[in-house]
């Protein structure tokens, strides 16, 4: 089965300082995982053109199928993603006609002038295409580079989510012929260290991703969320295998004195 690797880049000093929790990376990862991609790396860098350029270059050199960035597409001085991406690709940084028209229309509807800061959101790497942003002003940026699809999204979560969906619907050219499926349940009264050797054996048996997520302290009324996930070109087959593994884990948990609870 061909590897459909993806990388996620988050850009912003506010994330590195701990002021903002990086929920965008989590959303993007879950969404593209549902399409069949495997996220190999999530990287966060500061609002610096050289840093942004370097992280894009490094990602491109690893040759994933897809790179998605979030943050740094607004009108302020520290929104530098677009320029950093242009530098990484070795292309000019220029006003994109289609993006410019999108921005003109949005400000015109509001009766607002087109300032230098607002025009800045129309500047993109040469050869890029704007991705519609129905929740804000700055469009996303899509570019195909050496068979790698690259998307840059704004950092505001609702804008990122909207741009990501518009990208998937209207721009994404290649996607895996792979189905992803996961299921999970709660196991109460069994410590993670107790079930760990059984999990290790089932990973070998089923060739699936099995993860126990503690929801409480190990020694004090242990509670685990047990997650099982896998990918395959056959949707029905991977669903069957994951659920078979889930059932075996439930039986093991019960034998170990635990209580199974479904997640609603």
Curated annotation (Swiss-Prot):
Q: Which domain of life is it from?
A: Archaea
Database matches in NCBIfam families: PRK01215.1 (NF002291)
Question: Which family is it part of?
Answer: Belongs to the CinA family.
Name of the protein described by the UniProt record: Protein Saci_1508
Name the InterPro entries for this protein: CinA, CinA_Arc, MoaB/Mog-like_dom_sf, MoaB/Mog_dom
């Amino acid at each position: 089965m061909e590897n459909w690797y993806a990388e996620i880049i988050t850009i912003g000093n506010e994330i590195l300082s701990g002021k903002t929790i990086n929920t965008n990376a989590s959303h993007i990862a879950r969404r593209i995982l549902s399409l069949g991609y495997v996220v190999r790396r999530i990287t966060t860098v500061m609002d610096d053109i050289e840093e942004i350029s370097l992280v894009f270059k490094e990602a491109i050199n690893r040759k994933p199928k897809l790179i998605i960035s979030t943050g740094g597409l607004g009108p302020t001085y520290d929104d530098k993603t677009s320029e950093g991406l242009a530098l990484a690709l070795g292309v000019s940084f220029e006003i994109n006609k289609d993006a410019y028209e999108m921005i003109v229309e949005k400000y015109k509807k509001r009766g607002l002038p087109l300032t230098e800061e607002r025009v800045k959101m129309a500047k993109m790497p040469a050869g890029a295409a704007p991705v519609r942003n129905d929740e804000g002003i700055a469009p996303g940026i899509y570019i195909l580079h050496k068979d790698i699809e690259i998307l840059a999204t704004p950092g505001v979560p609702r804008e990122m989510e909207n741009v990501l969906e518009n990208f998937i619907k209207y721009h994404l050219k290649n996607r895996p012929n792979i189905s992803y499926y996961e299921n999970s349940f709660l196991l109460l009264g069994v410590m993670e260290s107790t079930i760990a050797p059984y999990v290790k054996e089932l990973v070998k048996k089923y060739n699936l991703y099995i993860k126990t997520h503690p929801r409480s302290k190990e020694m004090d009324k242990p509670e685990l969320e047990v997650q099982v996930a896998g990918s395959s070109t056959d949707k029905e087959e991977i669903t069957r295998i994951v659920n078979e593994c889930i059932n075996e884990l439930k039986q093991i948990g019960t034998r170990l004195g635990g209580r199974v609870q479904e997640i609603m």
